């Protein structure tokens, strides 16, 4: 009897959807190696492998059979995805065209030899970034350069603006996946895309105000409440939007955020917020570790860079990697909490993830432990351990959806004060 490798759902699934992977038709107790490979849009290969032993019936199910070693060990049904590593160091898995799936090739090899034995079975599976019926609408309106993702159907949907960080360009994968869960999501570029500024220093908050107005008047966006989600520099921009463009922004998710304005000064009308500086001489040899380089935003004169988040009207959800080495996200979340409470506001929701680094992505993305920083142009240590971060990404993804479902319900949120 020939071995068979089954993957469910069969043939295709959404990237954030778990898979059921099983092998049948092996000899009792047969040692095998499972291997996965994915090629990104620039041709880089990502790979993972794990050693297994079939049960007495010649079967193994990744949901019930622990890996004996390899890229991961233990019971990890999705390890063949999140444990993938690039062939080239510091390469990050990024989805550049969400209309085309990633194709994952899975193989079963005989034995536990490092170079692999005879191939016993093979399967190919497509991982899509747009659920059936999700619509992708390019937006080139006024100065706004973005893509709006709409769920299936003609109704109105809770609206979210999605910002990535200093990576620049237009990142659509998180927005496209969230649209599959019932949200109208605007993936917003703000520099290094088409005719937008090449440099982050030329971006003004009025640009984000224009994007907010666009969402509010869209016939398929359920007003009057809009949510924001941002990571890294995108997160402190979300904080600034919530603080200075506060009308109608009623729910903000901040992934490894700084409570101060970072990298470049912020301009809005007559407002000027300086950037929080850093001291690169504090870096040790080897990979650049930014965690201890940043100035303390509570000290003079750095406090001028603090974002007055207490002016925001809606609640916050802070998702914090405790091993973030780009900056002290855990410290900044505590500062935010103290500042809000000092102004009589409710405590924000803060979720701390141990052994989790800076780049918290949707589920099953391989955590980029170290990558080349798009602004600095150098290899930067992001922090995190793959197993722990894979769990954090799965938990964070559910919390993001729950948070937005709760607060983007078309009603004005109750204003709570503890004064």
UniProtKB/Swiss-Prot annotation:
Known catalytic reactions: pristanoyl-CoA + H2O = 2,6,10,14-tetramethylpentadecanoate + CoA + H(+); phytanoyl-CoA + H2O = 3,7,11,15-tetramethylhexadecanoate + CoA + H(+)
One BP term from GO: acyl-CoA metabolic process
Entry's Gene Ontology cellular component terms: cytosol; peroxisome
Keyword annotations: Fatty acid metabolism, Hydrolase, Lipid metabolism, Peroxisome, Serine esterase
Listed pathway(s): Lipid metabolism; fatty acid metabolism
MF (Gene Ontology): carboxylic ester hydrolase activity; thiolester hydrolase activity
Expression tissues: Highly expressed in white adipose tissue. Detected at lower levels in kidney, liver, brown adipose tissue and brain.
Location, primary (coarse class): other
Top-level EC class as recorded in UniProt: hydrolase
Cited function: Catalyzes the hydrolysis of acyl-CoAs into free fatty acids and coenzyme A (CoASH), regulating their respective intracellular levels. Catalyzes the hydrolysis of phytanoyl-CoA and pristanoyl-CoA, two methyl-branched fatty acids derived from phytol, that enter the body via the diet.
The protein's name: Acyl-coenzyme A thioesterase 6
Species in which this protein is naturally found: Mus musculus
